[in-house]
């Protein structure tokens, strides 16, 4: 009997793997080891937390991005880390969405947010880029603001005259990295699950304001 159940599970897994891509999740960041732990790479780091649970680590080069595939909440998902550098992220996202013939309603973007304390989350259905260059590039490429996003707080500049580029390209402290892993990214993963299950309002209720130091 156990063999029969194992066979059903194998068939189910293979069927899910063969299903067409129905959603794209994009983690925003900059490519290269020098940027790995920077604030601007919070989207890449959150993506790593997703793949730690679901697999599909983005390793294959396509669409000017590293991509992988997995299944979350019964949906076949393309996971993307654009390799265009932040300001041109929209080029990679638009190419993937065009290839799979998806709409903005099937897109979820995870990015950093300097207006939020480190780790604090904000889920939104749509809206402006709020000064985030990667989000702005995606909005310009798609011609719409109407796509879901999860914003991960990376902290405000230490002072008003502190250079913004220097701030977002500064690295998280070891304590901040540990906090993100333990207290913030689990909420990100749960939010992704709810959004892909069609419960974006539930994701907002579950995640917004959570995860901060």
PLM regions and their residue ranges:
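Nucleotide and nucleotide-moiety/phosphate-recognizing core
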Residues: 2-126, 136-151, 157-163, 182, ...
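Conserved TIR/SEFIR loop-to-helix hotspot centered on a Trp-containing motif
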Residues: 129
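Short, electropositive alpha-helical surface patch
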Residues: 160-178
């Amino acid at each position: 009997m156990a063999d029969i159940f194992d066979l059903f599970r194998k068939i189910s897994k293979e069927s899910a793997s063969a299903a067409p891509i129905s959603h794209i999740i994009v983690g925003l960041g900059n490519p290269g080891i020098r940027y790995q732990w920077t604030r601007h790479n919070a989207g890449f780091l959150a993506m790593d937390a997703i793949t730690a649970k679901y697999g599909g680590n983005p390793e294959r080069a396509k669409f000017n991005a590293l991509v992988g595939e997995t299944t979350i909440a019964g949906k076949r998902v393309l996971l993307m880390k654009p390799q265009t550098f932040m300001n041109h992220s929209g080029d990679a996202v638009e190419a993937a969405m065009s290839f799979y013939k998806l709409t903005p309603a099937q897109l979820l973007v995870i990015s950093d947010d300097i207006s939020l304390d480190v780790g604090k989350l904000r889920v939104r259905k749509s809206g402006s880029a709020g000064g985030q260059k990667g989000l702005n590039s995606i909005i310009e490429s798609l011609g719409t603001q109407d796509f879901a996003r999860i914003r991960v707080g990376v902290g405000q500049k230490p002072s008003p005259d502190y250079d913004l580029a220097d701030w977002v390209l500064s690295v998280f402290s070891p304590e901040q990295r540990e906090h993100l892993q333990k207290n913030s990214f689990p909420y990100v993963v749960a939010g992704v699950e709810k959004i892909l299950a069609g419960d974006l309002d539930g994701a907002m209720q579950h995640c917004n304001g959570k995860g901060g130091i």
